[in-house]
Swiss-Prot record:
Stretches in topological domain Cytoplasmic: 338-429
One family name in Pfam for this protein: Neur_chan_memb
Regulation: Activated by a myriad of ligands such as acetylcholine, cytisine, nicotine, choline and epibatidine.
PANTHER family assigned: NEUROTRANSMITTER GATED ION CHANNEL
Gene Ontology terms: biological process: behavioral response to nicotine; presynaptic modulation of chemical synaptic transmission; response to nicotine
SUPFAM superfamilies attached to this UniProt entry: Neurotransmitter-gated ion-channel transmembrane pore (SSF90112), Nicotinic receptor ligand binding domain-like (SSF63712)
Protein name: Neuronal acetylcholine receptor subunit alpha-5
Primary role: After binding acetylcholine, the AChR responds by an extensive change in conformation that affects all subunits and leads to opening of an ion-conducting channel across the plasma membrane.
Amino acid sequence: MAARGSRRRALRLLLMVQLLAGRWRPAGAARGARGGLPELSSAAKHEDSLFRDLFEDYEKWVRPVEHLSDKIKIKFGLAISQLVDVDEKNQLMTTNVWLKQEWIDVKLRWNPDDYGGIKIIRVPSDSLWIPDIVLFDNADGRFEGASTKTVVRYNGTVTWTQPANYKSSCTIDVTFFPFDLQNCSMKFGSWTYDGSQVDIILEDQDVDRTDFFDNGEWEIMSAMGSKGNRTDSCCWYPCITYSFVIKRLPLFYTLFLIIPCIGLSFLTVVVFYLPSNEGEKISLCTSVLVSLTVFLLVIEEIIPSSSKVIPLIGEYLVFTMIFVTLSIMVTVFAINIHHRSSSTHNAMAPWVRKIFLHKLPKLLCMRSHADRYFTQREEAEKDGGPKSRNTLEAALDCIRYITRHVVKENDVREVVEDWKFIAQVLDRMFLWTFLLVSIIGTLGLFVPVIYKWANIIVPVHIGNTIK
């Protein structure tokens, strides 16, 4: 009985040892038996330990300085990747940019030897203190850019390259549209920290355009940055202002807006080359006037509604519309002159006959009406002379009867021909007058643009090419 009892105690003891051995089996062996998951590498353990040590007691709402009076210096730079759009109507400039910021965070320093030689870590920007630098002249309410990771070095240097899409306000000067040159600015600064707490240092005066994607309508002539200060009643705030000088590429508007307008302007002159008895003269002038109105509406949709400046092309269109309106009035007057006769109007004044039948035709290189009538009459007498003499000899009594009627008909025909010739003289006179006015008006309006391009845009473009 004693032997049997000792055997039972030995079995219980062996069973207890096996149970204890199974309960205290290593966790890694248990996981390996269940799923075969590997252990963390040494580098991952070091980085995990580094993050725990750095951010265990880190407060991202507090400025990372050793003393309260210390100033954080922010190195600030700007890189532009795309000039998306320039909205002249709403006076907005849309850009895709990268904000480059660098500062020292004294709370994020470590010894690389204590963490497996780790010198750089990537930290989300919403996990540490970042400067609240925003675009002041923002137009859509989005003052900040995207939230991305920062690069933190062992000495506490934090580098943050932040992509952003901005719509900034830009005062558009459309005086020389579409040959205009605009100067748009972007002003950055801290929203809450004054200059005694955060100082902004301009890293590079030139905007980085290494990854710039060209715009089909605008070309950046220059993009420069400058540092300034804005003050209020108690404090001063440092700010960085970038000025973008952009030039419009005018080829599209030249081909589809300016050239058609100039063509319509000179088409008005052609109206006076049509015969005065053609009713299509009024129709042509009216069609030109309607076309110019359509072009004016197109320009009104593009440019801002401002009374400070009037675009050059708008002035030219208004000038041409006045030009066409006057041509319609003159054409109506010429047609009225053409259809005059002795039965509808009084006799022609002597000064009208002298000026329009003798002097003006010579000045306009036209054949004189008196010369043409004399030649036609002379030829008629030569052709019908013998027959007329034979008729007079044979029917002298009949000639006396009809002479009064023939003379009257000749007088009526001469008056009608005189008025028609005056209408031709008026058409020729207005043809040269309107052609001269059209040329002078076109040159007078577009010469300032040519002068501006020759003295401003071309030298800047040559300077950029040499660089």
